[in-house]
Amino acid sequence: VTDVTDVDEQGRTEPPLADDEVGTLTGFLDYQRATFEWKTRGLDAAGLGATTAASSMTLGGMLKHLAYVEDNWFNRSLHGRDPAPPWDTVDWQADEDWDWHSAAHDSPDELRTTWSDAVARSRTAVADALADGGLDQLARRRWADGRAPSLRWILCHMIEEYARHNGHADLLRESIDGETGE
């Protein structure tokens, strides 16, 4: 296991170059999380609510969506826990994109706190799963067809989820204030 101390100009810890599987996966996920934090850093409500082109996607909606995704995969799916607030009272049948739409009613501080709290819960959930069965541990909530993804799969999926949304965040942030960068 290699200690990671390389931090870039945006304050992101670089993923490890030579670590074990857990360190590599969590290092890349944390790097993607840090990239997303950078893309939303310092924006006010207008910035977090801005859209671009024909999309209704906003950085504020993305903060809330990624908070939901963190909680859904690492706590609800992996550990079989009941949804945490605010997800526990959502009528997803009435609005399947509630996380995106409701963000317009939240302050920037509320959105950032919702996301950072979800990330903290996810880190704890991953640590618990690693201690209890490692990367091969299967999610407690099975899919409709009876299959269950492993923690390894969930970590890879979350890296993909953040990488995709970080591409969206790049475009949105540049349209707001011209800030660019990976």
Q: What residue ranges belong to the model's regions?
A:
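Short, aromatic/basic-rich helix-turn unit that serves as a nucleic-acid recognition element
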Residues: 18
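Acidic/histidine-rich alpha-helical segments that form the ligand environment
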Residues: 95-137, 152-158
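Short, contiguous alpha-helical
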Residues: 2-14, 22-97, 138-182
